[in-house]
Amino acid sequence: AQGLSLAQLWRRVDGIDQALYQSRTGRPHPHRDKKVLTAWNGIMISALAEAGDTLGEPRYLAAAQRAADLLWAKVRVAPGEVRRLYLDGRALHPGLLEDYAFLGGGLVALYDATGEPHWLGRARELADALWSRFADAAEGPSGGGLFMGEVADTSLMVRPKDVSDGAMPSGTAAALHLLAALARRTDEPAYGERAKALVAAASGQVRHLPAAFPSLLVGLNRLRQGETGPRQYAARGAARIEARILPQDTGAATLIIDLALSPGWHVNAHQPLQDYLIPTAVRLAGDAPGWHIDGIAYPTPEVLKLGFQQEPLAIYQGPARIEAALTPEPDRGDRARVWLPVELGLQACGDVLCLPPETLVLQVPFRAG
């Protein structure tokens, strides 16, 4: 209303907030609950990491990293063992399922936002500990799944399981999300198998009252359909793909896809030298009406002979960038479209084997004028 730019608006809001805070410091502060709960902090770490990544706000990402490092130093009392809370310099009470699961999820979010492998390593440690500490190995209708507390805890007459959502997502749902994420980001098949076992153990309850299990159902979709958003993982975590769209003043746009591969891995070029190889290819998904691709610039491939193949191969094995020119259709009506679905087909190979072909659907944020 006053003709302010977005940056000017935020500066003005920050100034108002600072003035209010300075005024508030002149009055007695209310008492504060100083407990640092591991599960709740794990949720906040996820939120900060995702917000910092999506909004390009380094303050949020830095706060998530500080919180994660503090928890790792204070509530992780031994490898694979975390406490429920931290208070007055002490880590107290054995961690519950939700503590391991939510903190692990926060560490995965930090790995996604930064690409730093130590966050993924920490998340794997918690996921492995979660399964060994809370899994119900009993067979039968009531067996399987995860207990809320330690399997070795005999202080209760029964061992409850946290499956349905309440004010927060259930510990089981958080564990499912963690395992599904690690199944995409690592080459360890056990994570996917454990995630499927969780779904199977809860299937009877979910079928009876699905409305009580929204987080679990979202986790099931994540496990079966893969990730959503502009960042995806393929080749058992060996390939990391990120996409973005740069709008142009003309109404057209440029789609940029960056592909990073772990050492020892490659994907076939867009035009392989052999007809039987699966090419790397980009196209718009079927539910992206109103746009078409005018042209795609694929990177120049390397032509190499590898140990498992006598013939030369045209491949991408380092950081590779694909750029596509997007042009709107004349009668396009969704000018405020928020996401553009883009398909990337590829087949990844290591030193001794090739994995099955994969098709990823990247939901790329996009606002056009």
Language model segments and positions:
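Glycan-recognition and catalytic cores of secretory/periplasmic carbohydrate-active enzymes
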Residues: 1-243, 249-258
